[in-house]
């Protein structure tokens, strides 16, 4: 490195020395009167110099200097002398002092204030700053007063070759298609040099390839890289590394250089055809494989990549073109052979296919290399499998008359085992499709028979499923749908299509159509319905009505005369015989009711029956019934509301201390120790059911044959309890169907420990007047009150 720097300095100083000899007037210490020989500087500097010349020539004073230069990167033991300042006002008496200011004054440049010598005290770098602008001024040494106006000058840093070229964007990557012709442009690179491009050759660059030949070349000045060999093959080598050098000084010796790398990748083109790895492929497949299943894969290799390697696969020949197909798998770049139709080992055991692989994207530039396709042979062997039974037909359609006899054969299904072993077949009906079990099937021969009667009018079609099962392998089953159509037979007689009721006006005219009726038949003859209408033989000579057949298969009833009188006869019944056209024909008799009504002159019914009244206002019988029901419901609600108000205002029983609530007899202190504690409920005696004529009882009644009972008269509200009980007792005494009990009450403990025992022994078949209760007084004071109740005094009898 020091040797190279010395050579560079020598190259620079040589022209400077020559310039020093030939141009003595350009020395930077020249006096002011010789400054006119300057040839450098800006127009402003030249103008200012001319102006100074005019001033100095007039006053004989002024600055003397040149534009100064200093060499960059100079490093010596002493500060380098840049130049000297001098004015003609300086007689050499050292009374003038020079002052320097501006860029780098005092830090980079120093001035001797007495002599005016300027030195550079630091190493300069032109790439950092190329020139410095300074200001010089001469002042009186003692007073520091300016002797001349200040003036600017420039110190330029002279360049040396101290910067090597650099590739700022490296390393580089580029692509070029394979098989390119010679001289195909790949890319271009650019290097920069920080040295001065104007001064010398320090920044003049020359490019060259250090590594990458003989495949690539580079233009020395433009740095354009091109292919140096034709038809480079990506399949042989895909990537190349090129080392590029940029050298300054025009590439001469002593110049600085920089390098970078360029990676060149060859892109693929379709220059290779597909090629099968083998010419013959073998595959095997069971005969019961599902359609669409992949049987095998074939692949044609292609040295190209991407879309250039894509191939389409086709079956171009063979005896299985109808059974197999091949599809292209773009991901795996192979062909998938799939089953297209069912196979049968018993029919054919092997197949041969010829498949072809062809490139999809063809480059016409390489068509001379031959067809971009290849073929291979595929052998497919069918393997035997235990197959399910096969029916002779995929569906069956059977017909049966609805009057077919039970156990008669409707039809037959057949199935076989396609295997070589040929297992026997057993048939059955899927009962989920025949829930009513209307059909049976012979398990051996598949004959379908009728199990229950059929009715076409209920169901025309029956869809069942027949199952065929191999006897040797019950897992092998097949199903087939069977549609059974029920054929019609004439088993239904025709009848009126609806309920007809005709109305005849008293003032009707002879021949007037009273009613038009139509018939219906549940049967379905092939040629359609055709009905015959007639009157009963005894009604053929009917003096009042006649019938007329219409073309639309309907019947009109006509009046033979006028002058009908509904007072004499209000209703006429006309039996009509309806016959169908079946074989044999069936007939039925339907009766038409004809009512005689009073009508207006224009034929409007005015008085006949309920329906005749509602017809003019447009109301049907259903609407009338609905209106009446609403009215009745409203009346019931009103009655219930009034009844509830009366019960609320006038209660039946006054709940006070005098009310008899516990027993019929009120025992004060006398009954403190009695044992009959069964409560007496007055509400039971006032049971509404009893009022309506039915008396429910809690006692167990004897098993007797009862006679109808008379209804009980209702009891008015607000009556005395004593009178109420007497009325009930009288009713019970006169009731022949009543069981032998005194009352409807249950006395669980009454009479226990008493001399008389229970009151149930008392006879109640007679009235109070026929009974003698005097013996009750002998029972003691405990029954005194009871004896008074059942005894009849003279006052009572008189009453």
Curated annotation (Swiss-Prot):
Residues 643-799 are cytoplasmic. Residues 62-167, 168-276, 277-391, 392-494, 495-616 form the Cadherin domain. It is found in: Cell membrane. Residues 62-621 are extracellular. Keywords: Calcium, Cell adhesion, Cell membrane, Cleavage on pair of basic residues, Glycoprotein, Membrane, Metal-binding, Phosphoprotein, Repeat, Signal, Transmembrane, Transmembrane helix. Residues 30-61 form a propeptide. The keyword Mitochondrion does not apply. It comes from the Eukaryota. It is a single-pass type I membrane protein. GO terms for biological process: chemical synaptic transmission; homophilic cell adhesion via plasma membrane adhesion molecules; regulation of synapse organization; response to cold; synaptic transmission, glutamatergic. Cadherins are calcium-dependent cell adhesion proteins. They preferentially interact with themselves in a homophilic manner in connecting cells; cadherins may thus contribute to the sorting of heterogeneous cell types. This is Cadherin-8. The lineage of its organism: Eukaryota, Metazoa, Chordata, Craniata, Vertebrata. The gene is Cdh8.
């Amino acid at each position: 490195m020091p040797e190279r720097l010395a050579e560079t300095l020598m190259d620079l100083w040589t022209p400077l020395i020559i310039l020093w000899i030939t141009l003595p007037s350009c020395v930077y210490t020249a006096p002011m009167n010789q400054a006119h020989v300057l040839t450098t500087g800006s127009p402003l500097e030249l103008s200012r110099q001319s102006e100074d010349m005019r001033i100095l020539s007039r006053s004989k004073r002024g600055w003397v200097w040149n534009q100064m230069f200093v060499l960059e990167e100079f490093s010596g033991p002493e500060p380098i002398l840049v130049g000297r300042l001098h004015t003609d006002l300086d007689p050499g008496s050292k009374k003038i002092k020079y002052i320097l200011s501006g860029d780098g004054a005092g830090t980079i440049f120093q001035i001797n204030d007495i002599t005016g010598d300027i030195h550079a005290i630091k190493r300069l770098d032109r790439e950092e700053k190329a020139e410095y602008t300074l200001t010089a001024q001469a002042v009186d040494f003692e007073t520091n007063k300016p002797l001349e106006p200040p003036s600017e000058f420039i110190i330029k840093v002279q360049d040396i070759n101290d910067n090597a070229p650099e590739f700022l964007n490296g390393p580089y990557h580029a692509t070029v298609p394979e098989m390119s012709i010679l001289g195909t442009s790949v890319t271009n690179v650019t290097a920069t040099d920080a040295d001065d491009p104007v001064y010398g050759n320090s920044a003049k660059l020359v490019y060259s390839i250090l590594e990458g030949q003989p495949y690539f070349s580079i233009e020395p000045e433009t740095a354009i890289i091109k292919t140096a060999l034709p038809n480079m093959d990506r399949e042989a080598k895909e990537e190349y590394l090129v080392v590029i050098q940029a050298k300054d000084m025009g590439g001469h010796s002593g110049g600085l250089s920089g390098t970078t790398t360029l990676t060149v990748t060859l892109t693929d083109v379709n220059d290779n055809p597909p090629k099968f790895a083998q010419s013959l492929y073998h595959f095997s497949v069971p005969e019961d494989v599902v359609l669409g299943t992949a049987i095998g894969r074939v692949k044609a290799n292609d040295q190209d990549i991407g879309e250039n390697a894509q191939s389409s696969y086709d079956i171009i020949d063979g005896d299985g073109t109808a059974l197999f197909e091949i599809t292209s798998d773009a991901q795996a770049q192979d062909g998938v052979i799939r089953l297209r139709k069912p196979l049968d080992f018993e029919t054919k055991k092997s197949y041969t296919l010829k498949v072809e692989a062809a490139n999809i994207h063809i480059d016409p530039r390489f068509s001379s290399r031959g067809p971009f396709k290849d073929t291979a042979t595929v052998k497919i062997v069918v393997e035997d499998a235990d197959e399910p039974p096969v029916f002779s037909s995929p569906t069956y359609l059977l017909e049966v008359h609805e009057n077919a006899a039970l156990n008669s054969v409707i039809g037959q299904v057949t199935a076989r085992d396609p295997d070589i072993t040929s297992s026997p077949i057993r048939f059955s009906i899927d009962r989920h499709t025949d829930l009513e079990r209307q059909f049976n099937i012979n398990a051996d021969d598949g004959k379908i028979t009728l199990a229950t009667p059929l009715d076409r009018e209920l169901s025309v079609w029956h869809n069942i499923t027949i199952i065929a099962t191999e006897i040797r392998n019950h897992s092998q089953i097949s199903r087939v749908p069977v549609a059974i159509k029920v054929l019609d037979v004439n088993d239904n007689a025709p009848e009126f299509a609806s309920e007809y009721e005709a109305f005849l006006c008293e003032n009707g005219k002879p021949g007037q159509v009273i009613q038009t009726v139509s018939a219906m038949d549940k049967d379905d003859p092939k040629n359609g319905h055709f009905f015959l209408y007639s009157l009963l033989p005894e009604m053929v000579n009917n003096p009042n009505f006649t019938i007329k057949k219409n073309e639309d298969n309907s019947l009109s009833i006509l009046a033979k005369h006028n002058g009908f009188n509904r007072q004499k006869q209000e209703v006429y019944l006309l039996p009509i015989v309806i016959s169908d056209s079946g074989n044999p024909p069936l007939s039925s008799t339907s009766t038409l009711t004809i009512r005689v009504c009073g009508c207006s002159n224009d034929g409007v019914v005015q008085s006949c029956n309920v329906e005749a009244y509602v017809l003019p206002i447009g109301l049907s019988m259903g609407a009338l019934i609905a209106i009446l029901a609403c009215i009745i419901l409203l009346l019931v609600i009103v009655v219930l509301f009034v009844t509830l108000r009366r019960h609320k205002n006038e209660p039946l029983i006054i709940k006070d201390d005098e009310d008899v609530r516990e027993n019929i007899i009120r025992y004060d202190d006398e009954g403190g120790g009695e044992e009959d504690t069964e409560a007496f409920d007055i509400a039971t005696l006032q049971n509404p059911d009893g009022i309506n004529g039915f008396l429910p009882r809690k006692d167990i009644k004897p098993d007797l044959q009862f006679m109808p009972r008379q209804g009980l008269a209702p009891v008015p509200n607000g009556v005395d309890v004593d009178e109420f009980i007497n009325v009930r007792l009288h009713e019970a005494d006169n009731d022949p169907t009543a069981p032998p009990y005194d009352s409807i009450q249950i006395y669980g403990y009454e009479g226990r420990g008493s001399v008389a025992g229970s009151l149930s022994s008392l006879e109640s078949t007679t009235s109070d007047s026929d009974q003698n209760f005097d013996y009750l007084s002998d029972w003691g004071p405990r029954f005194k009150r009871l004896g008074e109740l059942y005894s009849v005094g003279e006052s009572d009898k008189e009453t």
